Every structure is written in structure tokens, then in C-alpha cells.
Amino acid sequence: IVEINKCLLAENKINEVIKLIPSLNIINGEVIIRSSYKDEVLIIISTNDNVEISKIKDIKNLKGIILNNKTIYKDNYFIEEVNDIKYNVAYDAFFQVNRLVCAKMFKLAQDFVNEGDIVLDLYSGVGTLSLSAARKAKEVVGVEINKNAVDNANSNAKLNNLTNALFIYSDAGDIKNLDINFNKLIVDPP
């Protein structure tokens, strides 16, 4: 492990927060910094050390702090927007980190679908590819094993008025047990 003050691949807001990490006094643990298109940040900390949270509560656009899977300050999610679709993203849910690449991927998912298609999206996460496809498809069903991501995906469908998208909590390996008829499949495994 190498201590850094800046990551050239990270967004500016993340680099601002990186500079404050040493003030948390974490000896053994992990800190994850997530940022949104609005420059909001979530800070996720996993450690048994006593953490000096007061050192980071005043960060501009701080959306929330999660310590050992418990929300201890503000929210445990942020809102992301790609190609005019908004996504609630829980702190532990996957979301593409490169917005330019993900915008192209989401557009490809939408272009892949025709009106009348019934789409099954395995490993659907918070609904990123599913909701893009739902703009054209007759129906989209997303399958995801992370319960928070499924909840986010269903609320994201409502948030974007996409009534033709439904997300279910299940292991993608169990789809043979699900009664879903589809003619298009999206697979974006972890």
C-alpha cells in the first residue's frame, strides 16, 4: 500500500477527499470514496479503529458517511445521471465509474433493443442497462443478487417513469427457476 495525495485517474472531488484521509487516523481498514455527477461524495469506511469523523463532516457536497455498513452521517446513497436517466445508487451497489464510457454502453443497450422486445438483464445492478433498454422495449426484467441494488433499481424505474421495467432479487444462476419469457438478453457480470 502506498500513501498518495492525488490520483490522476480520479475526479477532482475524490482528490479533495483523499487529502483528508490521513486525518481520520485509520491504521487498519479501508476507505472508499464515491462521487456523483453533481460532485457529491459518499465516504465508506471499514475499520475497527476509532475514526475521527469530525474531520470530514464539513466537506462540501458530502452526501453521507457509512462506517462498517452503518450510515452515521446523512445518506447512504447518491444520485447519478447518465443519458437523461437518473439513478439512486446505494453505497454498496455497483455503478460504472467512467461516465463517458458508461454513457456509450447505455446507448448501445438502448440501440440493441427494438419496440416489442422483452428483455432479461442479468446482473442488473441499480438498473443502468435495463432502464436504457426500457426506453424502447415492451418490457424489461432485471435480475440482481444485491438487495439494495434491486430496491434502487425499482425506485429508479419509478423515478424515471419507466413502468415497463421490473427488478427481482435472485441469483442469475437461478433463472431457470424463474418464469420469464424473453427474446433479448443483457449480461454484464461483475
Which stretches of residues belong to each language-model region?
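Rossmann-like S-adenosyl-L-methionine
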Residues: 10, 48-190
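Short small-residue beta-strand/loop micro-motif enriched in glycine and branched aliphatics
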Residues: 1-4, 41-43, 89
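Extended interfacial segments that mediate partner engagement and assembly in macromolecular machines
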Residues: 1-28
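Structural signature of eukaryotic scaffold interfaces centered on beta-propeller domains
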Residues: 34-36
